[in-house]
Amino acid sequence: MKLKRYLLVAKPGIIFGNLIAVAGGYFLAARGSVEPMLLLATVIGLSLVVASGCVLNNCIDRDIDRHMERTRGRVTVTGQISLKAALAHGLVLGVAGFGLLWWRTNPLTTALAGFGYFVYVGLYSLWFKRRSQYGTLVGSLSGAMPPVVGYCAVSGQFDAGAASLLAIFCLWQMPHSYAIAIFRLKDYEAAGIPVLPVARGIAVTKIHIVLYILAFMAATLALCLGGYAGYGYLLVAVAVSLWWLAIALTGYWTADDRVWARKLFAFSIVAITALSVMMSIDFQVAPATHLVASLF
């Protein structure tokens, strides 16, 4: 039972979601040439770093978590794990994760993981989440790091492919997070967290959601146009983007914003999972000229 508490405080659901993303970035860069030890080190190392960030986030959020129905049962709120023990747990996970990334990948990969960690723990959790409606935007930078870390573990450089992944996953985070904020609106209001639906209302948030999905759609095409992914990926990217946009647009005449937001959230998981899988397997592209060049 005690082991389960230490597992739960690390938010295993978030870790699993990031595993899919980091694998997508890794396989995209590897293009069929997989080094098993590098893959394992990247996946395990980043998982430990993410787990560490989640534990420290739980420690920081103890005061606001007790006001939210979704989070008031967390072990850091109920006292099932002491603050001292949770902090030690988080720090050990972080040291192990960064140590493994430094030892088995490359300095750039470790630095990118460190940047994401700093943004999530230092900027988002400690400051922006509590004080600004732009906290979601700041947090999206850390949420977009896993696929970039996976990609750069192979490539060793931050190129256009890495930049495309950063844009795709940053832009995806916004509608995904806003959907959560809408169907959990009362929780955020009770905790005094100024997410966009609380600060400016659901109507304004719906506009932002549509605009971010349009930007996400454009960003997903960059991997194919730049020669990093193939036509299968392109087909899936267009399909999931259009379907996600269609769901977003139904929000303008929905009778129940919470039901609509849950649908939007659920499909966001489908969309990003589908893209991660496709970029993992559809790396066969035309040589050098790339699709964008072949159009002229």
From Swiss-Prot:
Species of provenance: Pseudomonas aeruginosa (strain ATCC 15692 / DSM 22644 / CIP 104116 / JCM 14847 / LMG 12228 / 1C / PRS 101 / PAO1)
Underlying gene: cyoE2
GO biological process, one term: cellular response to iron ion
Top-level EC class as recorded in UniProt: transferase
Compartments in which it is found: Cell inner membrane
Keyword DNA repair listed: no
GO molecular function: protoheme IX farnesyltransferase activity
Top-level taxon of the source organism: Bacteria
Transmembrane segments: 7-27, 36-56, 83-103, 108-128, 134-154, 163-183, 207-227, 229-249, 265-285
Further comment: Carbon 2 of the heme B porphyrin ring is defined according to the Fischer nomenclature.
One Pfam family in the UniProt entry: UbiA
Protein name: Protoheme IX farnesyltransferase 2
Similarity section: Belongs to the UbiA prenyltransferase family. Protoheme IX farnesyltransferase subfamily.
Keyword Transmembrane set for record: yes
Role summary: Converts heme B (protoheme IX) to heme O by substitution of the vinyl group on carbon 2 of heme B porphyrin ring with a hydroxyethyl farnesyl side group.
Reaction it catalyzes: heme b + (2E,6E)-farnesyl diphosphate + H2O = Fe(II)-heme o + diphosphate
Functional pathway: Porphyrin-containing compound metabolism; heme O biosynthesis; heme O from protoheme: step 1/1
Keywords: Cell inner membrane, Cell membrane, Heme biosynthesis, Membrane, Transferase, Transmembrane, Transmembrane helix
Organism phylogeny: Bacteria, Pseudomonadati, Pseudomonadota, Gammaproteobacteria, Pseudomonadales
EC code: 2.5.1.141
